[in-house]
């Protein structure tokens, strides 16, 4: 398994669930033994075999055994026998009935038969490989042989050593065999030592052995095998020990220490409790639970009472769960549990000797074994010549045949005569395949004194494993699966209606799954109950079968008995259930037939009763087997012989034969079972009644008490068989005896005994009578059959035949006459189906009154029509000929029914009609004559050729009349024409016909017209002339009325709007502009036309003219900075401009410029409300601010200054005196020349906008004001200092106006600076005046604010999100080419206040030279203020752009991340815990999900310094065009109030630095610094939100 790379991944491994195995993708054919060629003799073997045959025999060369896919080979006679059966689908569906036929035909002689399912039969494999587990044992073939492990010489020596002592020491060592290396002759000598009889028992590999693997830990049963398997799996997954024990304890719901200590105790010391009941009876399951004891139960070990006790099903002893000897057998069924004392030592298997496996681990082990075997097989075949030694003389044939080996052992003194012929062995092995040769050579070395070329199983080769899972299946067990009710489903084969064992208790005869590996062989075996065996190969490589036929079974048993020691012969039950593997050469030498064949996947093998077989696996295989029974099991006395054998040997059988017979007699109601049951039951009832009569004579005083049928069944204490019919019990005891062994169990007295009778004498006779009665039902049915069909002249009705068939199906009568009746009914039903087709009637089959039996073949034939009838329904047939055929068939029927008379009468009428019709065909007919003959033919209700001819003649005549009517009408529709053409095609008219050709041409013209109309109506714009043309063409063709109505409707609407649009367009081109329509009128007409689905062509022209007018309006909006506003805003803003210009350009008198502030109205003595102030030229209102230089009063509202932000001693300089103070504006001020161009373009507009007159007034007013200024200031160069009030006066008016007077404004500002300088530099030339109001929040910013208010986002997250949106907007703005106008950018009102204080402060201002940038950008802060100085070095991360390597090439400056870029608000950052440096997520290969799981982070540099490997891939970002003034340290991104204040503080510092930069002559490297210090701080909305 794959190793995990980290501890986190290891903890996620689950040892409870096994790896998944996909059998569909698993390539079994890649194994070396899955190919067919390895099951064939090799070329080298054939040559060696031929050479050996030439040397050893004179009969000629011997041919190798062929691995024919279809036949089996008899290894004794070399005869080929066909054991392969490929049934059809019908035969395969019969199930057990088909198997019974196979047994009589093939299997009885050969012992086994291969059944190949039909091609479409493929049962799915339903094993869950993630949970399926099974027991495995090492399957070394040498350990299963009496010959290889324990040679006869050694056994004889052991018997001589022990003498007559039956009790053998358990701790004695095994006999050892020393072999000499002599090439001439090998003699085996045995060192005689005491041996362990338990180890000798193990070679028999009993299938009923029990694995002792369970222990109790804190009152809970724990499987040691399961823990051992999980421990091996955890080692493969590199799982830590504490993690393994934690998962195991969680599964068992125990603490870790208790579970681990308990496992280690048994794993290290191997503690077990063995009892000495070596000769005890084997485990047998009673048919039902034993009776409850009357006395209070007590534990056998602690002698204490208790409620939680478990009872042994054999000795009836009670145990506490905590007192049970450990390890013990599993509690799979609490009623069939066996204690350790009752399990014979030969059947006990400790948990260390076996293993649990899963499919994946077993498959891996199989592949390893196959790989090792692939390497050793060629060398074995090359180095082991299968020939006799060169110095060994071949004895003559007579001597070889008479060669015998006789061994005598003391003790029992038995003699064994076994044929061991080395020559025969070599010949046999040369005829086998390479794999078989390797198996039989290495697994069974010869024990003869002659030299042997064979050796034991190679130690370097892994021992194959054998897996078994009892009481489980790989067949579907879900009702939703199609194979659930399949008769070949092994899991449910016992419940088949033909199975005699379907009434046995559940859980007795269950299926077993076997998993094999290369060289796996289970030993010779047969069913101990002489049952049939069904073996299905689910998946995997081929399996080689070796079968001993039933006739040679006694020979094999005698040979096995002769090979067994005396103490084994004394226990024949051990041999009955054993699996001993004897070499096939030994069997053939003793005259025992052995058949061999190959089984592939998806094939069945059926074994007969008393047949011995073994299977050699050639690779990984998964198969399933189950014992079952057919009627032959009881008829052929297999069942009775098996139960008699169990009874004679005193072995407990798994169930009772009496129960099987009586259950089939009383519960089964079919005649089928009565036939084979009648004879068997008669013999059993006679024997039972005879035994009861004799018993009553010997014990007349015993009381006979009836017992219920469902009561418990007890076994006889002497013969161990179930006393089902009658039993003898003590009143106060637990011993039970049958009627035959009363004296053996109760020899003394009869006083306390009672006979319990389940079936009394009358009940037995009644059961037999019912069986006989069911069997005689067939005779009764035969009498009725003979009465109905017995005589030759009798013609029974169909009703009588159906009654006979229903009776036969009810009683399941297996008679040949039933098939005859079924065929007659089927033939009659087919005739009736044809009759119903002719006369257009429903099937005359009547429904049965009762529900038919499931799977009944008769009812399926009656209820479903035949294939012939279906063909008649699906095709046009000649019913006249069919009626004649029916009449001919009915004349041959031997039965009668009413429909036959109707058919005869109809046939006579048909004959008369045909004669008359044929006579009329020879002359011309009128329409009336043709109509009469057609009506006469239709009255017969039959399809005849004559009737069809006259119908076509009439239809052609009618078609011509219809065509003439359509061609003459003007309103014919397309549907009528299509219907007419279809009628003509049906009656056989082609395009060669003149009328048909005309109809097709008319259809083509109509379709073209419809396509033109549909295409025109689908367009958005229509041509009215084209519509009128199409309408006129509709009168001469066949049209679609719905399409014509739609055309008329569109034409009517388009005609009305066409007139309006033509008039609108012609007026828009009128030379007189004021005669042109207004824009509102054009909008109204186009809005009405918008509702049209198809618009006229003039609509597009009018829409373009309207768009041209809208473009003029949009141009005006853009001039005032309202590009995104609706069109109506242009008119509204012009009204605002007109009002502002009127106030600003008002004539205030010739002396107004020379009066300032309070002095003016104090001196004049006038009302202050009559005078104007500020640049808005409005009277005094609200709070007013006085300029410290010109002493003009300004509205605080106009300057956007609040009373809260002003101090009493604060100084103010107006924008007129200091050009650097900006005037707050809500919109752009377009130059006058642009507005004049718009007025000049008015005559070119197609429609009249409503803004025309308003725009003209605004422009006219501005021109008049300009002329007035130029008249007063004729020559600007002649202005002097005394004209400063005049310049200030007009500058206020120019700033208050909403129109930009470019020349006047620039000239007056230059002159004013010349006469009264305030700023260190003259004002720059301005060519535009834009709005400086704060932007409104975007849609995204409003959504973020709503999320913060609703609580979905915190204030810090909201601030970061808003800053990120501004960063994107600014990046988009930077991507456009522009010039950074640092020195011409006006300042905000918040920066204007500090500059006003500095202007009127007595301290001199710093010069421009002092503010030039130095090598370290942080030094720029030292010349500003102490407050800003704090932000120089310690807060360089706040102004991240100042220490960026993109700006200053300072080697000592700290590096930011790996990408050398600053941090933005939207970036994710992480800090190293060693160097405390910050990094971007993506630069160091991290993400937010990864960072959330880290407790400590080390950067790549720190990892390299410590000698560690950095676990992530670094991906430094490229250098984009970033907005450096938005780079902040990661601490600012946390969103706290202190960080937000610190951020605002840094923005203020950068803005102040920008204000004091020099004008010109800056170094080249200063452009970057100037770019950083530009006033690009967040807008006022974001600043306000961050302050929140």
Swiss-Prot record:
| InterPro entries linked | JmjC_dom, JmjN, Lys_sp_deMease-like_dom, Zinc_finger_PHD-type_CS, Znf_C5HC2, Znf_FYVE_PHD, Znf_PHD, Znf_PHD-finger
**Where in the numbering of this chain does the JmjN domain appear?**
82-124
Keyword Nucleus set for record: yes
Keyword Nucleus among UniProt keywords = yes
Q: Which parts of the sequence belong to the JmjC domain?
A: 475-645
Q: Which Gene3D superfamilies match?
A: Cupin, Zinc/RING finger domain, C3HC4 (zinc finger)
The family database entries (SMART domains) matched by this protein are listed as:
JmjC (SM00558), JmjN (SM00545), PHD (SM00249)
Zinc finger intervals, PHD-type: 298-345, 1171-1220, 1454-1505
This protein's UniProt keywords = Metal-binding, Nucleus, Repeat, Zinc, Zinc-finger
Which segments carry the region annotation Disordered? Answer: 38-60, 385-412, 848-872, 1319-1341
Q: For bias kind Polar residues, which ranges apply?
A: 51-60, 385-395
Report the GO molecular function annotations: zinc ion binding
Check the record and name the Pfam families matching this protein.
Answer: JmjC (PF02373), PHD (PF00628), PLU-1 (PF08429), zf-C5HC2 (PF02928)
Q: Name one GO biological process term.
A: chromatin remodeling
The record's subcellular locations are: Nucleus
Say what the protein does: Has a role in regulating chromatin structure via global deacetylation of histone H3. This function is associated with the activity of a histone deacetylase.
- Put simply, this protein is called Multicopy suppressor of chk1 protein 1
Give the source species.
Schizosaccharomyces pombe (strain 972 / ATCC 24843) (Fission yeast)
What is the name of the gene encoding this protein?
Answer: msc1
